C-alpha cells in the first residue's frame, strides 16, 4: 500500500526539481528551506559509490572530523581497566567501566553513541561483536575507537568526529549537522566528508567512484547534489 504523504512533505517536495543535480550551496539552502518540522532536523547525506563491499578491497570504513561539529550531544562510553578508567572519566567520558560495563552492554544497555576500548580489553569486548556490529558501535582501530590515547579520542568524538562505513550496497549514510546550521557551515562539513571519502578510496574500486550524492533534512525530501561541483569546490572554514 502506498504511503500517504503529509501536506507538509508535499509542499517541501514541490520545491525540489527531482531531475536536477544542484550546485552544493544551492542544495544546502534548499535543505534548510525544506526542513519544516517543529524540531531542529538533522542534515543527512547519502553517497552512492562505485564499490562492491562484499570484496574486502572494496570496503570503506573510516572516520571524518566535521569542522563545524554535528550539533548533537554525543555520549561516549569507554571500556578500560586500571588507571585508564580514571583517565577516561577525567577526559569527559559519560560511561566508564571494565568487565561490568561489558556485561551491562550484553544485557541491553545502549545509552551511548560512541564506544571506545583500550587494546588490552578487546579480547573481552570481542564477545559483543554480534550485538554491536550491526549497530556500527563495535570498537575498531580503523574507526579510531580502539586506542590507548583515551583523552584525545573522547575529545575528538565529542567535538564532531564520526565513524562511517559504506553499507552492503555501497552507499554511505552520514549525519553532517543540523538544519539550523548556516548553509555555509553545512557546506564546510559536506566538503570535509567528500575529501575523506576520496582520501580513503578502497584499493579495489574500479571505474567511476562517485555515482550520486543526495542531501536532505531528516523529515524532508531528497535533493541531488552535483558531484563534480562538490569535488571541485574550494571552501574555507572561516
Curated annotation (Swiss-Prot):
Binds directly to 23S rRNA. The L1 stalk is quite mobile in the ribosome, and is involved in E site tRNA release. Protein L1 is also a translational repressor protein, it controls the translation of the L11 operon by binding to its mRNA. Part of the 50S ribosomal subunit. It comes from the Bacteria. Keywords: Repressor, Ribonucleoprotein, Ribosomal protein, RNA-binding, rRNA-binding, Translation regulation, tRNA-binding. This is Large ribosomal subunit protein uL1. HAMAP family: Ribosomal_uL1_B. Gene3D superfamilies: 3.30.190.20, 3.40.50.790. It comes from Gloeothece citriformis (strain PCC 7424) (Cyanothece sp. (strain PCC 7424)). GO terms for cellular component: large ribosomal subunit. The lineage of its organism: Bacteria, Bacillati, Cyanobacteriota, Cyanophyceae, Oscillatoriophycideae. GO terms for molecular function: rRNA binding; structural constituent of ribosome; tRNA binding. One of its GO terms (biological process) is translation.
Amino acid at each position: 500500500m502506498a504511503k500517504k504523504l503529509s501536506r507538509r512533505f508535499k509542499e517541501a517536495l514541490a520545491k525540489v526539481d527531482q531531475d536536477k543535480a544542484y550546485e552544493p550551496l544551492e542544495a544546502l539552502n534548499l535543505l534548510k528551506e525544506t526542513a519544516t518540522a517543529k524540531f531542529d532536523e538533522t542534515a543527512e547525506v547519502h553517497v552512492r559509490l562505485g564499490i562492491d563491499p562484499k570484496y574486502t578491497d572494496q570496503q570503506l570504513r573510516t572516520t571524518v572530523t566535521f569542522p563545524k561539529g554535528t550539533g548533537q550531544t554525543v555520549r561516549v562510553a569507554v571500556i578500560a581497566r586500571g588507571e585508564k578508567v580514571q583517565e577516561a572519566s577525567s577526559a569527559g567520558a559519560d560511561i566508564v567501566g571494565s568487565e561490568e560495563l561489558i556485561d551491562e552492554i550484553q544485557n541491553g544497555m545502549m545509552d551511548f553513541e560512541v564506544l571506545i576500548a583500550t587494546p588490552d580489553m578487546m579480547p573481552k569486548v570481542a564477545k559483543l561483536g554480534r550485538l554491536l556490529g550491526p549497530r556500527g558501535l563495535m570498537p575498531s582501530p580503523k574507526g579510531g575507537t580502539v586506542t590507548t590515547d583515551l583523552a584525545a579520542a573522547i575529545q575528538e568524538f565529542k567535538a564532531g568526529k564520526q565513524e562511517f562505513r559504506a553499507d552492503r550496497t555501497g552507499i554511505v549514510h552520514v549525519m553532517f549537522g543540523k538544519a539550523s546550521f548556516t548553509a555555509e557551515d553545512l557546506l564546510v562539513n559536506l566538503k570535509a566528508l567528500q575529501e575523506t571519502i576520496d582520501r580513503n578510496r578502497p584499493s579495489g574500486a574500479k571505474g567511476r567512484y562517485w555515482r550520486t550524492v543526495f542531501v536532505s533534512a531528516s523529515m524532508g525530501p531528497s535533493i541531488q547534489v552535483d558531484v563534480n561541483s562538490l569535488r571541485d569546490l574550494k571552501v574555507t572554514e572561516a
